Amino acid sequence: MSATNPTRDDFAALLEESFAKTDLAEGYVAKGIVTAIEKDVAIVDVGLKVEGRVPLKEFGAKAKDGTLKVGDEVEVYVERIENALGEAVLSREKARREESWQRLEVKFEAGERVEGIIFNQVKGGFTVDLDGAVAFLPRSQVDIRPIRDVTPLMHNPQPFEILKMDKRRGNIVVSRRTVLEESRAEQRSEIVQNLEEGQVVEGVVKNITDYGAFVDLGGIDGLLHVTDMAWRRVNHPSEILNIGQQVKVQIIRINQETHRISLGMKQLESDPWDGIGAKYPVGKKISGTVTNITDYGAFVELEPGIEGLIHISEMSWTKKNVHPGKILSTSQEVDVVVLEVDPTKRRISLGLKQTLENPWQAFAHSHPAGTEVEGEVKNKTEFGLFIGLDGDVDGMVHLSDLDWNRPGEQVIEEFNKGDVVRAVVLDVDVDKERISLGIKQLGRDAVGEAAASGELRKNAVVSAEVIGVNDGGIEVRLVNHEDVTAFIRRADLSRDRDEQRPERFSVGQTVDARVTNFSKKDRKIQLSIKALEIAEEKEAVAQFGSSDSGASLGDILGAALKNRQNNE
């Protein structure tokens, strides 16, 4: 057979040899012989009854440079054995795709990477040419981080990983991101192996967040947390760092599993907390600058890297429920006193009010117990009155200290907020910041004096003047203590029931009665004429009569009365 001028018999021999082993059917790739080349198509015989026409452009470079010749053996895809024009429908392009599919399936099963070219942008991603087969590249799989402009990546051969293949639907999904992540992981692993905790390295600030900065250590990033940037308070990393800035850092921790690296800058400097207890002893007065104000207090910088907290309770002696921002402001210079130092927890407790005179102590010094004071009623509660006093302090009058004789719940209704009242200082507790006042102490405690004299002890006999008469009994006033009054009930007016008539008593009349009860708590005095008469009767019987004397009760009482008159 001549290579330059093949005969028809030669073509027949080649075809028989080519198709002897082939059982042709639609939808498969078959080998054929180029029998002729016309203007823009190649005539291909695949051993069917009819030949097929294949566009030259589907042969790619061979068609362009003229290397495709009559007699060449080619692979084409048989779409239809014969169409309406009596020709076989063949496709070199689909044959190439079929070849690619078969090759890609092998690599997909083996987990191997494939090479492709991003050539077009579609909804949700891009199309990739995998040497004849078209795959879909989702936008999320282009890179490790989102990329706005993909133009530099297009039309350049790159490695991809096949995520999914569906031949029935003709779908292939690939990822460039997984390839980058694997490469990056390998690179990170190699870099991490060469790093050690405590090692000092240089890097470039790559990104800044609210909680820290990411530093590129040459192929792997480390996190420099805001708390490890300086010993002093750093409110935001941007205060001391800029993107692109070269920094020297120390490796604090390395997680070999996750390849996460924690970095520190302050660790390169000496720890200002070393020896802090000796430098700031408890009780020392120092100056500082307010750096931050919160709901619970204010932070004060004593020196770079050393801050202390003034708790809200240590800000003012008298302003208890005021936000710290109403007392202090950031950047303000303040004098404070060291209250507590905890080097382990790196905490210093400071006091602002301790730099000022304690108003409770000052009040106690100038107002000892028994001192009379004057102030305005600031509040009225269920347990007493709060009185505003000198020095911006308050004192409390308890219900029990409002009046000697009347219930406090009744007396407190006579006072209103804003009233100016006088009171007596009863006690000052500097530690608890409490001042106890009394209003009733401004007057005499007549009942207390009477009780102290012994006249109100149980069974004591007292003389009283009638000052009032009603159906229930009589109201009397003690003769020896005119400010002390009591009430004798009808049933206690006489042992004789017929004599228990209040109307037989008159105002100004003096009567004797026996104390049957006295309550110090509610200050109530119970008197009884009846009890006195019964007691006197028993005493007379015991003194002037006996069981065998034969004397009548009248004789005994008469003798007792006569004896009493003689004694008087």
UniProtKB/Swiss-Prot annotation:
GO terms for molecular function: mRNA binding; structural constituent of ribosome. Residues 27-93, 111-177, 198-266, 283-353, 370-440, 459-530 form the S1 motif domain. It holds the Pfam family S1. InterPro entries: NA-bd_OB-fold, Ribos_protein_bS1-like, Ribosomal_bS1, Ribosomal_protein_S1-like, S1_domain. PROSITE patterns: S1. This is Small ribosomal subunit protein bS1. GO terms for biological process: translation. Binds mRNA; thus facilitating recognition of the initiation point. It is needed to translate mRNA with a short Shine-Dalgarno (SD) purine-rich sequence. PANTHER family: 30S RIBOSOMAL PROTEIN S1 (PTHR10724), SMALL RIBOSOMAL SUBUNIT PROTEIN BS1C (PTHR10724:SF7).
